[in-house]
Regions:
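Conserved mixed alpha/beta catalytic, RNA-binding, or beta-rich assembly cores of soluble enzyme
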Residues: 76-115
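Structural signal for hydrophobic packing residues in well-ordered secondary-structure cores
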Residues: 9, 31-39, 60, 64-71, ...
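Accessory alpha-helical/coil subdomains and C-terminal extensions
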Residues: 1-63
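Internal helix-turn-beta structural module
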Residues: 105-196, 201-202
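Short glycine/threonine-rich loop-to-helix capping motif typified by GTGT followed
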Residues: 53-63, 69, 88-102, 128-136
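Predominant activation on well-ordered alpha-helical scaffold segments within soluble catalytic domains
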Residues: 28-32, 36, 54-61, 65, ...
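A short beta-alpha structural unit
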Residues: 18-19, 46-54, 79-91, 123-127
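Flexible, glycine/charged-enriched surface loops at secondary-structure junctions
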Residues: 1-8, 38-48, 69-79, 114-121, ...
């Protein structure tokens, strides 16, 4: 060990050309550009999200609720974007991944909100030991789960988000993407969709 420590450190080669061609920051910026082309005002909140997956999901859900009440600075149509990689502390023996768990934890907060959609996906197309990259949930997900007798808190305590989300067709399956620059989370908020929903129900 001492011999290795005392050895000269490698020097930069004069003919070396190092370029970063992909990063989580670039991923978020690309997502922001896509959102903008679809008419959403993008906000990149963080590219280093690294908390407990369930807490991140609840955070996104609370953002949506605050926006719905008109108590946030977000405009009527926006995309709230984050990048990073959350963690899961296992308490059960179910099947799932951090992105699926994040999305499921947001479900109770989004319940009944026709103007909010949350997507959480891995850039490599893999989320935990599953074939899914992540999940997409909205204001109808909670009721659809409840109709099947599936309760979010029970599922989360068993870390079984995969099977619950599979039952309501909320998994995002892309297959391997050939890259890996952490995960992408985006919350789409659109007040106009609420107005359209009210018109249809009138």
């Amino acid at each position: 060990i001492m011999q290795q420590i005392q050895e000269e450190t490698p020097k930069t080669l004069p003919n070396a050309n190092i370029q970063i061609i992909g990063s989580v920051s670039a991923l978020c910026q690309s997502a922001a550009r896509c959102a903008q082309t679809l008419g959403y005002t993008p906000f990149i909140l963080s590219t280093m999200l690294d908390c407990e997956a369930k807490e991140a999901g609840r955070f996104f859900g609370s953002l949506a609720q605050t926006w719905q009440k008109g108590e946030s600075f977000f405009p009527s149509k926006c995309a709230v974007i984050c990048g990073g990689e959350t963690v899961v502390h296992l308490t059960g023996n179910g099947k799932g991944g951090r992105n699926q768990e994040l999305a499921l934890a947001a479900v109770p907060y989004l319940d009944g909100m026709s103007q909010a959609v949350l997507v959480a996906v891995g850039s490599d197309g893999t989320d935990g030991p599953t074939d899914a990259a992540g999940a997409i949930v909205d204001g109808t997900t909670a009721q659809r789960l409840q109709d099947l007798g599936i309760f979010v808190d029970t599922v989360l305590s068993n870390n079984d988000a995969y099977h619950a989300l599979q039952q309501v067709d909320s998994l995002v399956i892309t297959g391997p993407t050939g890259t890996n620059v952490n995960d992408l989370y985006f919350l789409l908020l659109d007040a106009d969709s609420e107005k359209e929903s009210q018109k249809k129900n009138a």
